[in-house]
Amino acid sequence: MAKEKATLPPTGAGLMRFFDEDTKAVKISPRGVIALTLILVALEILLHAFGPQIFG
């Protein structure tokens, strides 16, 4: 006779699923991340171009 198969608990064997966690952190959309990155790149380019003239 075959032995009964042991089953795992329905909670995913104790593994934490991060998308279930509710945090109070600042949430930013992917578009926001891209926009912020583009702004920082533009600022970096402007500072390299005009920084020596402005800051001596």
Swiss-Prot record:
<feature type="transmembrane region" description="Helical">
    <location>
        <begin position="30"/>
        <end position="51"/>
    </location>
</feature>
<comment type="function">
    <text>Involved in protein export. The function of the beta subunit is unknown, but it may be involved in stabilization of the trimeric complex.</text>
</comment>
<dbReference type="GO" id="GO:0005886">
    <property type="term" value="C:plasma membrane"/>
</dbReference>
<keyword id="KW-1133">Transmembrane helix</keyword>
<dbReference type="InterPro" id="IPR016482">
    <property type="entry name" value="SecG/Sec61-beta/Sbh"/>
</dbReference>
<feature type="topological domain" description="Extracellular">
    <location>
        <begin position="52"/>
        <end position="56"/>
    </location>
</feature>
<dbReference type="InterPro" id="IPR023531">
    <property type="entry name" value="Preprot_translocase_SecG"/>
</dbReference>
<dbReference type="Pfam" id="PF03911">
    <property type="entry name" value="Sec61_beta"/>
</dbReference>
<comment type="similarity">
    <text>Belongs to the SEC61-beta family.</text>
</comment>
<keyword id="KW-0653">Protein transport</keyword>
<keyword id="KW-0812">Transmembrane</keyword>
<keyword id="KW-0813">Transport</keyword>
<keyword id="KW-1003">Cell membrane</keyword>
<comment type="subunit">
    <text>Component of the protein translocase complex. Heterotrimer consisting of alpha (SecY), beta (SecG) and gamma (SecE) subunits. Can form oligomers of the heterotrimer.</text>
</comment>
<feature type="topological domain" description="Cytoplasmic">
    <location>
        <begin position="1"/>
        <end position="29"/>
    </location>
</feature>
<keyword id="KW-0472">Membrane</keyword>
<dbReference type="GO" id="GO:0015031">
    <property type="term" value="P:protein transport"/>
</dbReference>
<protein>
    <recommendedName>
        <fullName>Preprotein translocase subunit SecG</fullName>
    </recommendedName>
</protein>
<keyword id="KW-0811">Translocation</keyword>
